[in-house]
A protein has these predicted regions:
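GHKL (Bergerat-fold) ATPase N-terminal catalytic module, capturing the glycine-rich phosphate-binding loop
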Residues: 1-174
């Protein structure tokens, strides 16, 4: 039988080999490489749904008159697939919170907040926070440029090669 010690225990965070964890996560959830496109389009659709819902209650929205759309294009020279949307966008803090933490869903948080405020938001798709990472099945590097719907927001670029680190840098936005 062990004696009780009157000392506070040390608290430690789990450590993970992110590249290996991402690989296991992505390849166990997705069996077909093409699924990444569906996941990115789903994220874009959620971003548009969020901005539609937000415009019902918020007045200070950047680019109120912008057409809500999702565009998929290809840059063969750079070997890039580009998925663009005119949805809610993300702040630097959103990028850190939602892309810097695997399985952390900004959509789930938005849905919970909307339900708490009695808003209808059932058409949001992504709620598990892992679909975005399926892009690493087909890409050596993933880049995301985003600017929040909020007035005076800066644009930020998030990029990673799927290893243990990612980068965030402010960028000019067209």
């Amino acid at each position: 039988m062990s004696k009780k010690v009157k000392q506070k225990p040390e608290v430690h965070e789990y450590q993970a080999e992110m590249q290996k964890l991402l690989e296991i996560l992505v390849h166990s959830l997705y069996t077909e490489r093409e699924i990444f496109l569906r996941e990115l389009v789903s994220n874009a659709s959620d971003a548009i749904s969020k901005v539609q819902l937000t415009t019902l209650t918020e007045k200070n929205i950047l680019d109120k008159d912008v057409e809500l759309e999702i565009t998929i294009s290809f840059d063969e020279d750079k070997k890039m697939i580009i998925v663009e949307d005119s949805g809610c966008g993300m702040t630097k803090e959103d990028l850190l919170e939602n892309l810097g933490k695997i399985a952390n869903s900004g959509t789930l948080k938005f849905l919970q907040q909307a339900q708490a405020e009695n808003k209808t938001a059932e058409n949001l798709i992504g709620q598990f926070g892992v679909g975005f990472y399926s892009a690493f099945m087909v890409a050596d590097r993933v880049e995301l440029v985003s600017r929040s719907w909020q007035e005076n927001s800066k644009a930020w670029q998030w990029s990673s090669d799927g290893g243990g680190q990612y980068e965030i840098i402010p960028v000019d936005y067209k």
